[in-house]
A protein has these predicted regions:
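Cytosolic catalytic regions of ATP/NTP-dependent phosphoryl-transfer enzymes
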Residues: 13-122, 136-147
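Short, acidic loop-to-helix structural element flanking the phosphoryl-transfer center
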Residues: 151-158
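Generic N-terminal initiation segments characterized by hydrophobic and/or small/turn-forming residues
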Residues: 1-3, 29, 34, 154
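Polybasic, Ser/Thr-rich amphipathic helices
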Residues: 1-11
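Divalent-cation
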Residues: 127
Length: 158
């Protein structure tokens, strides 16, 4: 015996596979000082040069967080510069020699926690000191022993 059904057929529902949450990184509290020592000769750098120096050091790191920093800096005009002698330590931070387009020599670029960078640089500019006071999980950028920038990296699950 056969069963005949003349009613409506059920629509097949397609369920999408559940998406796993992804950790998304972003740069926050970015402080950039182009004249950290006031009118002292030879210490002023353009924001593009500062961002390019940071980018040229961070580009050696292959993590999702560093990719977020690279994207952030490229939005601000950063371009890759020639770099050498790259080093990274989880406790000390990043370091490399970077050759600017507007200088004949290369500069030492340090990126790391305030306690480490303060030992290798002149006293921090007040804007950078204020950023440090606002967040202890901050990266400080020093170029040839002068602090030019500070930033934090935050993450959220999406």
């Amino acid at each position: 015996m056969r069963f005949l059904w003349f009613g409506k057929k059920k629509n097949k529902t397609v369920t999408e596979p559940r998406r796993e949450p992804v950790e998304v990184f972003s740069v926050d509290n970015f402080v950039l000082v182009t004249h950290p020592l006031g009118n002292a000769a030879g210490t002023a750098l353009s924001s593009e040069v500062i961002c390019s120096c940071i980018f040229s050091v961070i580009v050696h790191e292959e993590s999702v967080a560093s990719k977020a920093v690279q994207d952030f800096l490229q939005e601000r005009g950063a371009m890759p510069l020639a770099s050498s002698e790259y080093t990274h330590s989880s406790s000390q931070g990043y370091a490399a020699r970077v050759k600017h387009q507007d200088r004949d020599k290369s500069s030492t670029v340090l990126i790391g926690p305030p306690a480490v960078i303060s030992k290798a640089s002149v006293p921090f500019h007040p804007e950078i000191s204020a950023a440090i006071a606002a967040s202890q999980e901050i990266f400080i950028v020093a170029i040839d022993g002068i602090t030019y920038a500070a930033f934090t990296i935050s993450s959220e699950m999406q």
